[in-house]
Amino acid sequence: MSWFAAHGSKLRQCAIIGGMFSGVLAAACMPAAFAQAPAKDSIPNFASKDFGWQQNEEDWQDPPPGSGHGPIRENPAYPFVNNADGNRTHQQVTVRITNTKDPILKPWAAAQIEATNQEVLSGKREIPFTAQSRCWPGGVPGQLLYPFEPFYAIQTPKEVWMIWQRDHMVRRVFLTDKHSTNVKPSWFGESIGHYENGNTLVVDTIGLSTQKNSYIDNFRTPHSEKLHVVERFTIGADAKSLTAVVTVEDPDTFNAPLSMSKRWFKVDLPMIEVVCSENNDDHFHQNLFPIPQADKPDF
């Protein structure tokens, strides 16, 4: 008997229960995938209304050995000091200064990053440095860098929804579709996924917008509309950790693919309301960034 034949009715109940819980799927709806080594055709359980996935690091970590070029890093001449470290050590809080000498960057990308580096170094601190600082979506893969606030998941036979606590932003991964021929660019693009090895969700994303402040990291690394992102979300054997290995390809921006990783831990907390526009202050003076408003509708 197939997995869906065995659990299809339960999953249909999940879709109903998920709606009752403000879009967060009840853990009881999914069979215990990790009581023993998962079968290759089983589905990992990421979803619950009672727990989320949280990470406490703001930047990408190195990928597994042999995965290729790692993430873009800081200029070692200007070490980054975050708010927590600044408060603890009484150092001046700084903004990330990117290593624009990294040979993986195309000339235009290095020049754009260097321009923002110089704005920071010259003291022009009022500029917003990421989409998130203006309460915009983080995009793909940048949305994965949200620290300290968990994301939650809904799983159905046709889709996986990733719901961030901040602004309750929703990213949809379609499990039964193929990529469209002409994808309209958007913040989260078009994400097509499938399961592998009983513990991994593989997500392939194209059609990502190049709007201002849409970066792949917190070092203000830009991208073109040719950006192609593949994420492999693997749940730990104890079901208490979640690791993503991310591969970024963009032949107009990078001379080779980038690889990076991110790890979350299970937190037994329900989703709460977090409204970004109430908290959109800058690093230095607690000045509020303006919330952007469109001059005309885009629909």
Where would I find each of the regions flagged by the language model?
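PEST-like low-complexity, intrinsically disordered acidic/proline/serine-rich tracts
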Residues: 34-299
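Basic, alpha-helical terminal appendages of large translation-related enzymes
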Residues: 2, 25, 36-37
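N-terminal secretory signal peptides that target proteins for export/translocation
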Residues: 1-14
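Bacterial N-terminal signal peptides
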Residues: 14-29
